[in-house]
């Protein structure tokens, strides 16, 4: 049964006023009486809408600089009153039923994100009356509609029109779920903020919690259910953070192809985050979360051609990311040359999409252009817990490198070293990357021994007929022994970039000097597990 409830009276009190005037106009035009508070009431009155201030309705003024506005029995009685059960007591106390509550909360997250935000500023942006009304209306969803998202305004008006001025129980229940999600996320933000400011409460520690709150509350919104997870016997879904601004796989728009799989999303994230490191036209090809070919070029077609040559076998069924618009010529080269699961780029031309559309299994995503990376947190689930760390946004420039060998790198070796250092950051540890002329020529990933990663990189280069002589090699972490340098020298590497920091650095540097290799220390590690 639909259990419709007519909407005759609505209380509107919003911080984010986007769309509220139009929504209020639509409600008023349908005979809905409007109650409102503070700035919302003033805005509606300025637009010529008939609106009753809550203070006039309750007979009690706003007080304490607006801290107390709606905390009154005539407001909450009107929201919580059960139709058909509490009518007599509502009439006795002159409480009018409120059929719809439209509320969004003080911008706490935006406030504390501002540079120089004080604790006092944060406290004043903790909404009290708003969440109370939201929870009251959500609790009484059998009779009251609670609206916390402006994106629902149009659909609500359409349903009111389709149901002779009423909303169905199904809609009210869905709105109530959104309301509880909204207040849960809001309280989580406050708890995280305050939790990061207090001393640790376990044991005798007096240290401040610092970057990480003592209780971590996370809020993610389900974007899609999936056919299965990493393997077919695992169920899965994709959740995204709310209000993410940075271009990412989470914010990307799929413009073509069938639904993304769990592994598609994970691999696309790896490819996109890697290609973001480059300012020049770049292409990254990823397979099983590891780059198998990366290059920069004069155009994305040139970059793709060079990236593909690194490892054509692994590129089959891979993910391809670009940092420029996907054009028709590049799209044609991809489709003609290989099977690809996903292509992601800031944008795609109409001509390119016509070409990729010929292959129904090709998924095309556009993510928009990106600017500066946004600091955030990375999570790794372990059984019974969660590891949390800052995103690895670290990178070094030429001026920060230390040459620790007798021989200085040539200009080309230095360029290649910086190039493959960027790539190594996105290769699973132990990671070794060989590069020459701004393209990868061999990648050794995920080996338990660093020397074997170095050997694999050399084998891959040899298999594809790519000349290693004169190339640069990047290692994501220090060399514990000289054997990795010996393997690189045997392959033809002439420049090495690595963090340094081993107790055997002297031995490793001596090996480089023996082979005439230039070695650069970054003093920064990029483990990736």
Curated annotation (Swiss-Prot):
GO terms for molecular function: IMP cyclohydrolase activity; phosphoribosylaminoimidazolecarboxamide formyltransferase activity. Pathway: Purine metabolism; IMP biosynthesis via de novo pathway; 5-formamido-1-(5-phospho-D-ribosyl)imidazole-4-carboxamide from 5-amino-1-(5-phospho-D-ribosyl)imidazole-4-carboxamide (10-formyl THF route): step 1/1; Purine metabolism; IMP biosynthesis via de novo pathway; IMP from 5-formamido-1-(5-phospho-D-ribosyl)imidazole-4-carboxamide: step 1/1. Pfam families: AICARFT_IMPCHas (PF01808), MGS (PF02142). Keywords: Acetylation, Hydrolase, Multifunctional enzyme, Purine biosynthesis, Transferase. It comes from the Bacteria. Belongs to the PurH family. This is Bifunctional purine biosynthesis protein PurH. The gene is purH.
């Amino acid at each position: 049964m639909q259990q419709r409830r007519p909407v005759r009276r609505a209380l509107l009190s919003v911080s984010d006023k986007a769309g509220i005037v139009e929504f209020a106009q639509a409600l008023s035009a349908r005979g809905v009486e409007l109650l409102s508070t503070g700035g919302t009431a003033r805005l509606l009155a300025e637009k010529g809408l008939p609106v009753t201030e809550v203070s006039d309705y309750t007979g009690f003024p706003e007080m304490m600089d607006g801290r107390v506005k709606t905390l009154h029995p005539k407001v909450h009685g009107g929201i919580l009153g059960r139709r058909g059960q509490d009518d007599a007591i509502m009439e006795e106390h002159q409480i009018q039923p409120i059929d719809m509550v439209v509320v969004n909360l003080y911008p706490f997250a935006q406030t504390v994100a501002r540079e120089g935000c004080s604790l006092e500023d944060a406290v004043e942006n903790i909404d009290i009356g708003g969440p109370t009304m939201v929870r009251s209306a959500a609790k009484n969803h059998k009779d009251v509609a609670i609206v916390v998202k402006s994106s629902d305004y149009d659909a609500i008006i359409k349903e009111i029109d389709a149901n002779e001025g009423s909303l169905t129980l199904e809609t009210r229940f869905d709105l109530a779920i959104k309301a509880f999600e909204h207040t849960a996320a809001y309280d989580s933000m406050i708890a995280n903020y305050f939790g990061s400011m207090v001393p640790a409460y376990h044991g005798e520690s007096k240290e401040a919690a610092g970057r990480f709150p003592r209780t971590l509350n996370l809020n993610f919104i389900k974007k899609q259910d999936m056919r299965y997870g990493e393997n077919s016997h695992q169920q899965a879904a994709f959740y995204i953070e709310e209000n993410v601004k940075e271009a990412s796989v989470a914010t990307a728009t799929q413009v073509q192809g069938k639904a993304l799989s769990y592994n598609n999303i994970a691999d696309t994230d790896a490819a996109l985050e890697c290609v973001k490191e480059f300012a020049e036209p770049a292409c990254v090809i990823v397979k099983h979360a590891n780059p198998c070919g990366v290059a920069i070029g004069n155009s994305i077609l040139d970059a793709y051609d060079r990236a593909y040559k690194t490892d054509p076998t692994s590129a089959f069924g891979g993910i391809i990311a670009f940092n420029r618009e996907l054009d028709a010529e590049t799209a044609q080269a991809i489709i003609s040359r290989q099977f690809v699961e996903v292509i992601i780029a800031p944008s795609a031309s109409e001509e390119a999409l016509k070409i990729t559309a010929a292959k129904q299994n090709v998924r095309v995503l556009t993510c928009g252009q990106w600017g500066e990376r946004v600091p955030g947190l990375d999570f790794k689930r372990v059984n019974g817990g969660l590891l949390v760390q800052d995103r690895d946004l670290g990178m070094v420039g030429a001026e920060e490198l230390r040459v620790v060998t007798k021989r200085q790198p040539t200009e080309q070796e230095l360029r290649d070293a910086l190039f493959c250092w960027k790539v190594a950051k996105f290769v699973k540890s132990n990671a070794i990357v060989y590069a020459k002329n701004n393209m990868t020529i061999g990648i050794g990933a995920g080996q338990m021994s660093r020397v074997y990663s170095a050997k694999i990189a050399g084998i891959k280069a040899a298999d594809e007929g790519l000349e290693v002589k004169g190339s640069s090699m990047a290692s994501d972490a220090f060399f514990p022994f000289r054997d990795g340098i010996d393997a690189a020298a045997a392959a033809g590497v002439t420049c090495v970039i690595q963090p340094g920091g081993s107790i055997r650095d002297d031995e490793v540097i001596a090996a480089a000097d023996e082979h005439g290799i230039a070695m650069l220390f970054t003093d920064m590690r990029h483990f990736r597990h």
